[in-house]
Regions:
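SAM-dependent transferase fold signal centered on methyltransferase-like domains
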Residues: 1-248
Length: 248
């Protein structure tokens, strides 16, 4: 078995996960890349369900849903083999999604599978174990993405260990900024708002990301930026609470 195993096919990695997990030693690193973006973004929901055992919802944060669908699929395949996978890191660009997990040859007592619920009427979103049919904010129909991974995507110790090593490599300055954003995301709720999305709902010019974070933190909420979108805002505040604070 290998200490580092890389699955990087053209298209979906799902058919190779069983072999990839079996080929990784206890404590080893498995990296998985997906390039079938139209499927993960919800253009072909039936294909997504066949490949990743879950369906997406088309939203502003579709890239996060895609990463969580991939992690959820890996978790389900690993569970069948009595193996635990622990997400360490994830990255994306215009052409692919890539996740890194630690493989542990033992059963996983934690259940980090669930759904992202998204209301296309008011914009409310949340994660939970079960599906709902109506939005708790506006009462209208709510859509469900999943089942997918609803736990942490980034491991704090893994991300922290990378930062001091940057000086040993020739990398761009944006690399450090991105890693610092990963640090901020640890412990934050899944999904994010975009400033443009909030501005449309308020019918006003977008507020700056720094101001938005500061305002929510002063009000007692968790708030921070995300590596998944340069104008993305992660917070545990509901959409109605966010809009109320920004409109005042």
């Amino acid at each position: 078995r290998g200490a580092i195993v890389d699955i990087d096919p053209f298209g979906s990695p799902s058919r190779y996960l069983d072999c990839g997990i079996r080929a990784t030693c206890h404590g080893g690193l498995l990296s998985v890349t997906a390039t079938d973006l139209p499927v993960l973004h919800g253009l072909y929901q039936a294909a997504c369900q066949r490949r990743y055992y879950g369906i997406p919802v088309r939203t502003e944060y579709g890239n996060e849903i895609a990463l969580r669908l991939i992690l959820g699929c890996i978790h389900l395949v690993a569970g069948r083999l009595d193996v635990k996978v622990m997400p360490l890191f994830a990255q994306h660009n215009m052409h692919y999604y890539r996740v890194y997990v630690k493989v542990l040859v033992r059963t996983d007592p934690e259940d980090n599978m669930g759904y992202i619920l998204h209301c296309k009427s008011c914009g409310h979103r949340k994660t939970q174990k079960e599906q709902n049919h109506s939005c708790e904010v506006c009462g209208k129909k709510i859509e469900s993405a999943g089942p997918l991974w609803i736990g942490e995507i980034y491991d704090k110790a893994f991300v922290d260990s990378m930062l001091p090593k940057l000086e040993n490599f020739v990398v761009s300055k944006s690399c450090e900024k991105t890693l610092l954003k990963y640090q901020q995301e640890i412990g934050m709720p899944a999904t994010y708002f975009t400033l443009d999305e909030l501005a449309r709902k308020m019918r006003s010019a977008p507020i700056s990301l720094e101001k938005a974070i500061e305002k929510l933190q002063k009000a007692g909420f968790k708030a921070g930026s995300t590596s998944l979108n340069s104008s993305g805002l992660k917070t545990n505040a509901r959409i109605d609470e966010v809009l109320r604070f920004f409109q005042n």
